[in-house]
Amino acid sequence: MRSRRLLSAAHLLCLCAVALAAPGSRFLVTAPGIIRPGANVTIGVDLLENSPPQVLVKAQVFKIASNKSRSILEAEGVFHRGHFKTLVLPALPLSSADKIYELHINGQSENEIVFSNRTRLTFESKSISVLIQTDKAFYKPKQEVKFRVLTLCSDLKPYRTSVDIFIKDPKSNVIQQWFSQKGDLGVVSKTFQLSSNPIFGDWSIQVQVNDQQYYQSFQVLEYVLPKFEVTVQTPLYCSLKSKQLNGSVIAKYTYGKPVKGSLSLTFLPLSFWGKKKNITKSFEINGFANFSFDNYEMKKVMNLKPLTDVSEGSYENVDPSFPGPAEIIATVTESLTGISRMASTNVFFKQHDYIIEIFDYTTVLKPSLNFTATVKVSRSDGNQLTPEEIENDLVTVVTQRKNNHPESQRDQEMDYIQTVNYTIPQNGIIKIEFPVMSISGELQLKAYFLDGTSSVTVHSMFTSPSKTYIQLKTRDEYIKVGSPFDLMVSGNRQFKDLSYMVISKGQLVAAGKQSSRTFSLTPEASWAPKACIIAYYIAEDGEIINDILKIPVQLVFENKVKLFWSKPTVKPSDKVSLRISATQSDSLVGIVAVDKSVTLMENSNSITMETMVHELELYNTEYYLGMFMNSFAVFQECGLWVLTDATLIRDSIDEVYDTEEYSERFAEENEANLVDFEDASSVNNVHVRKNFPETWIWLDAYMGSKIYEEFEVTVPDSITSWVASAFVISEDLGFGLTTVPAELQAFQPFFLFLNLPYSVIRGEEFALEVSIVNYLKDTIKVVILIEESDSFDILMTSNDTNGTIYRKTVQVPRDNGVTLVFPIKPTHLGEIPITVTAASPTASDAVTQTIVVKPEGIEKSYSKSVLLDLTDSNVESKQQSMRFSFPPDTVIGSERVQITAIGDILGSSINGLSSLIRMPYGCGEQNMIYFAPNIYILDYLTKQKQLTVNLKEKALSYMRQGYQRELLYQREDGSFSAFGDIDSSGSTWLSAFVLRCFLEADYYIDIDQDVLHRTYTWLNAHKKFNGEFWEPGRVIHSELQGGTKSPVTLTAYIVTSVLGYKKYQPNIDVQDSIKFLEFEFSRGISDNYTLAIISYALSTVGSPKAEEALNLLMQRSEKEGDTQFWLSSGPALSGSWQPRSVDIEIAAYALLAHTLHHVSEGIPVMRWLIQQRNSLGGFVSTQDTVVALKALSEFSALVHKENTDIQLTVTGPGIPRSIHFRIDSQNLFLLHQEELHALDPITVNVSAHGSGFAICQLNVDYNVKGSGSSKRRRSTENQEVFDLDVIVNNEDDISHLNLNVCTSHLGSERTGMVLMEVNLLSGFSASSDSIPLSETLKKVEYDNGKLNLYLDSVNESQFCVNIPTVRDYKVSNIRDGSVSVMDYYEPRRQAVRSYNTQVKLSSCYLSPDTNCKSHTDGATDSLRRSSSLLVFCSVLLYFVQH
């Protein structure tokens, strides 16, 4: 309840002497007790019969500040005796602030001041409505959030203003923001892209308007849309005397058809005491099933015991004496797919069979007027009353007593008791009305029906010195805007005229006089959703006699919008028209259509009628105490201030509160356009279904001069129902809403779906399961046809007698489904599409899905780049050669060779922004490879004036997604660590890295400044007095851990990061850290990595030691041809064409230092770096890729040359015709590429003519065989740095396989972060949730047949992990899987082992009809389409099987 400062009567009336001397009552003035920006202040003026004939009324609103008042609103008008009219003051501006406001009002006739007073108005900040609509309430990673912001005035007219919008993740970090957004008619539409790995939980859209905050939440989580809905129907109440509890379960697909399957039903008591017990039953279900639990079953699990009369079914509870509710849980499992869905409901237990409810009864007694109430009789089991039960009467006993008599003094003479019987109608609702005795001070109503009983008691008495009362009521139960309703006024005295007023949302919205005791009013839109009606008259003695009636008013929008589909039912991929009908032209219609499966997930962020009613109720300021016991309280109950010279009665307690045309036409068209699913379909022109969105339509439609619009759209391929809704908004009529969503059923009564693995390895065979569903009227004969392809063969099984290998015929019963199996053997590598068609004389369907076929063995890659520099005017041509030989264990057919050329140093990295390296990046540092390179690319292209709109949007999208993901790893203290809050501490190295990247990105995307500040503050707290930074957490980058110089390296790294924070905190001082670095440099730095970072750090601050450090670094470099680089010492590593990751970082830091000193001397370093790039545009690992791209982008901007025009010619033994690439200023960033024949060895000759420079790169991908030695604990081929052992456990289990993987480091020191990659066997899957995390194992990711396990570090102690896997698909002749362990920041430090299942499937197991006698590997024959071969193989199979 709001506190109101309404002035008491003593303070209220300040009337002049003339007014006080005047005989009789002359005026009654009312005004709202509040003032609201945007809303008029409406004053009611009723000049009574003793008033002067004409009064000039003037009202002003003053704003008071610093003891000074200023008039800001005013109005005046002439009022006449005997009339009740209103005076309307203009509204406060919507931007008004919460200040002190006073209303001054005075009335003047020719000769006198009739009245004059003032009152303080309470400021109500709720002045506008801001609605935030999203297309859904739930989102998956990588999905797009579509949302609208609507700003409306309190009358639902558009409010044109600018809004600020913020997207916040569950940690309240600002992920994206838009400032000063304005939209047409107050509607702003935006979209927001979620990253592939966002923080799960409740996200929010925050909108700021006029310093007010508005929110809408949405959830981000992993989910699968339900394809069918389960509902449980039970009565809300059940009598303990009932013989049983009955209910039903309904299971329907979103397209309306029944679900066939099994039903598990559980009765679970929800009491808080005793041992939990339940009842579980199982049934078959075909869309509907009835169930019952008898009283004996329920008694057992609810701890009930029979009373003496067991036959009556009465029970008492053991402890306590009355049972709590029970939950009924229904789980339906679809027979065709095995998918389950659950629903539940609660049942409350009553001690009686019948429930009596008394409501809408009089709460304040008015003697001699009627007491009214509504009584409802119902069965506790929810069933209708039977004709036999209705023959019994409802018995009411009314007891009326005198007031102020304690119980001990009461006797029956003081009580008036009356018993009345009522006949019960079919609906069980009875209206009761009887007079209140003149002596009554208390009234009790008791109602009885069979064993049910209920009662209410009313103690409150209306206060009137003259005992004069009126009663205001209506018989209309449903009152809505625009429809008249009747009001009846009864009283115990005669009266002539009656005044009335209507108040809603704190404002006086209607007023007038009536001479009849029955009159009608027509609600306007301003009345909704609740209105408070006051009726009154002035008695002869001057007393105000009044009453109040509160009514709900159903909201009816003046601006109407309707959506219609041109057809109610369509087939997937059909064309259909969405038709829009609006009331007014120049309207904006916002439409959303979503899969009905989305609506089954309970929550919704749609704008509905309930949304609007709730929104409008927020404007209401009435007290709603329900205890208006005198004439003053009646006005107060509706939030009114009253000024009158009539008698206004109040109690002492009151002092406390002083502070359709289109629908018919479309319906006809819909009837004519019903889809006839029995029509014959053309098998030769079957649409293949591929498009399955969750949100189909999100459209802002501008109607222009029309009130009718039609859009043709293509129905997606989902077999479901689509639910479309819309709102409309226009300048004059404001907001409107579709009252009923337009539902479109996208359904075909005959369809198929495929079940196949995501990928297999060449040489493996798999079972393609084809399920056909038939909802036609009859059983049909269906031909299943696999589209022939050179990419796979179909294996013949012994029982294939009803068709050929590509074609089968099957009978599919009506309202049922059948599954067929086709054994498939892929023959080509890559993505293989499989198209299946199901055809019958009456219907057909086709579906295409792809399967990825990978080569066997372990993936390897090689890249070689050459820089063709023709920038010297004296050089017109250059030639370069590149060579590669495949190792002897290369898998035949896995080889892929490609030549690329591009005209810009960063060109290949720009083209590969989405995936720069071949490693997963699932921790806080590695994620930044998805973020940081985009900054450097944008910087570089902006400087070169080569930034295109498409590339900018692409880079910004990657950055926003990377930013979202990175915030997963921010800890509560503001620091960042590899795995966020699960780590024991934040990392200064990683926090500095993230801070630097966020500061660099702040120019392009929205970065929450609070995130930056918290990170910087945490970093600064980890600096020692001498300027040295220290690392409290684990250092996952191996080059930064251990050794005497690691604090020096860390400090240099952090200095380069925190300097960027100067734009937010200009007084940052890093001189102590610089002096620390200079001192350590003067002592000597033997490590090249540390020296490189120090050189860069000292260069960024202009240290006098910077050039000396850089010179020393260059002296230690290696030179080869026109390149310059560094080689770090270290243990022997697994073979790789790329250098160590640390060597790339050293070169990158040296190049960054050269951007500040002696630019030309850095060109040889740049050339070397370019040559180390992989085919994706990145380098070895994440950190080296980020630093190298930063260095190349900044350095290239300094040495970039204009006017490139180069002709490249590529020749070689495997190139029958020369390949020509033309690179000029118009296509510098175009990646030219050609596939080459994979000859061994590969020799590629490149010649360049012209001017400028180009980069040519040879990329080779291939697989090597997993040799037998790789299965042993350790390879003798390479000096591995990890010991790795893989043990397979599944001796007798065909469906499960457990891997036990153990590893340790073959060295005394602890490693940095280690990545374990487990390539699963084809057909098997593993859940990342089934592998528990530990201090060593920090994260597990599942990625399309592969598990990535992130280990914090590995030492000499063995670390083991158990990986349970499950067979999801039947795959025979399974090839080896592999397990690898590698140092993430030095991937050449690795070990690889292969493994396989001990229980292998032969091809005969792929068909369910085949009797397989052996579970060892069997040979399979791939049968071609040749008829002779088919006969031969059939004979061969016959002899083999016999």
From Swiss-Prot:
- GO MF, any single term: serine-type endopeptidase inhibitor activity
The name this protein goes by in its record: CD109 antigen
Q: Report the sequence similarity comment from the record.
A: Belongs to the protease inhibitor I39 (alpha-2-macroglobulin) family.
- The UniProt feature for the cross-link Isoglutamyl cysteine thioester (Cys-Gln) gives its location as C923-Q926
- Tell me how this protein assembles: Heterodimer; disulfide-linked. Interacts with TGFB1 and TGFBR1. Forms a heteromeric complex with TGFBR1, TGFBR2 and TGFBR3 in a ligand-independent manner.
Q: Which domain of life is it from?
A: Eukaryota
Q: Which residues form the propeptide?
A: 1420-1442
A GO cellular-component term linked to this record: side of membrane
Q: Which residues form the signal peptide?
A: 1-21
Disulfide partners? none
Alphabetically sorted, this entry's keywords are: Bait region, Cell membrane, Disulfide bond, Glycoprotein, GPI-anchor, Lipoprotein, Membrane, Protease inhibitor, Serine protease inhibitor, Signal, Thioester bond
